[in-house]
A protein has these predicted regions:
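Short, glycine/acidic-enriched loop or turn micro-motifs at the edges of active sites
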Residues: 36, 69, 144, 182, ...
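Active-site neighborhood of phospho(di)ester-bond hydrolases with catalytic His/Asp-centered motifs
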Residues: 30-32, 60-66, 90-96, 140, ...
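Active-site-proximal segments of metal-dependent phosphoesterases and phosphodiesterases across multiple
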Residues: 23, 144-153, 169-214
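Bacterial N-terminal signal peptides
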Residues: 8-16
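N-terminal active-site segment of His-dependent metallophosphoesterases
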Residues: 20-78, 125
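Extended active-site neighborhood of metal-dependent phosphoesterases/phosphodiesterases
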Residues: 73-163, 168-169, 198-208, 222-257
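Positively charged n-region of N-terminal signal peptides that target proteins for export
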Residues: 1-4, 189
Length: 262
């Protein structure tokens, strides 16, 4: 009987250890505020791409807005050509500098251009969802293309959609990717998001959001608010390597590592 119990407890311990061993980690890279300008020196962007390509175990790269210096297809075309040099899949968020209906580059036109010029680019709208290693990534669009400005604005339909997506994936860990921070990383009122409290009400209804990753302010900052990591990254040459450790557990650890390309 003692031998049986000994074997039983040994089996339980080994099973638990295997469970720990199988805990998954995943890594992605955030690049923000590239501000690509056709006809200008964009070597810094090229250096960042080269640096990111050297990093190991990166699942994907996300560009979190202000990808262009101004809303033009020339800038967008140059940005895409450089981004295509990445050796990992990449996703694109729209920022305030990227779109302007009066400049013939609305958000609809921007997405159409991406789909036309990037093979296998799947998103059909500025806001979209994708899944990597059982983690749900939600791209939330807060840009304005009718009256562009530096203040982010997450419209009611975007917040309703976000609420529905968080409900749909309530049993999964979620990371939100966007250009405009909800929690200001510095005191720049001209960059604040309009009515952030409405966005925070949506977050308060759910416990599956682990991080909100953004750019826009030109500031590197990390802070935790109500259990959610709010990570803001400045423009190039800075970028972040973000590790989600124990990604398949209810409480993963988010580790954001700041890097700078030379």
């Amino acid at each position: 009987m003692k031998k049986f119990l000994s074997l039983f407890f040994t089996s339980v311990i080994l099973s638990g250890m295997c469970g720990i061993c199988e805990a998954k980690d995943m890594r992605f890279v955030q690049i923000s505020d590239v501000r690509y300008s056709a006809g200008s020196d964009n070597q810094t962007f090229a250096n960042v791409i080269q640096d990111v390509n050297k990093q190991k175990n990166v699942e994907f790269v996300v560009f979190t807005g202000d990808n262009l210096n101004k809303p033009s297809t020339d800038d967008l075309d140059g940005f895409i050509k450089e981004a295509k040099k990445l050796n990992r899949p990449y996703y694109i968020v729209i920022g305030d500098k990227d779109v302007n209906k009066l400049k013939h580059l609305s958000k609809v036109e921007y997405v159409k251009y991406l789909k036309k010029h990037i093979r296998k680019y799947k998103p059909e709208t500025p806001s979209y969802t994708f899944i990597k290693d059982n983690i749900v990534f939600i791209v939330a669009d807060g840009a304005k293309d009718v009256i562009p400005g530096t203040n982010g604005y997450f419209k009611e339909d975007v917040l309703t959609w976000l609420d529905n997506e968080l409900t749909k994936y309530q049993d999964k860990n979620v990371i939100i990717l966007q250009h405009f921070p909800i929690i200001p990383p510095s005191e720049k009122e001209a960059y604040y998001t309009f009515k952030p409290e409405e966005y925070m009400k949506v977050l308060a209804k759910h416990n599956n959001v682990k991080a909100v990753i953004s750019g826009h302010f030109g500031v590197n900052n990390e802070q935790s608010v109500r259990g959610v990591s709010h990570i803001s990254t400045a423009g190039i040459p800075d970028y972040r390597i973000i590790d989600v450790m124990d990604a398949d557990t209810p409480n993963p650890t988010i580790w954001a590592q700041l890097k700078q390309a030379e």
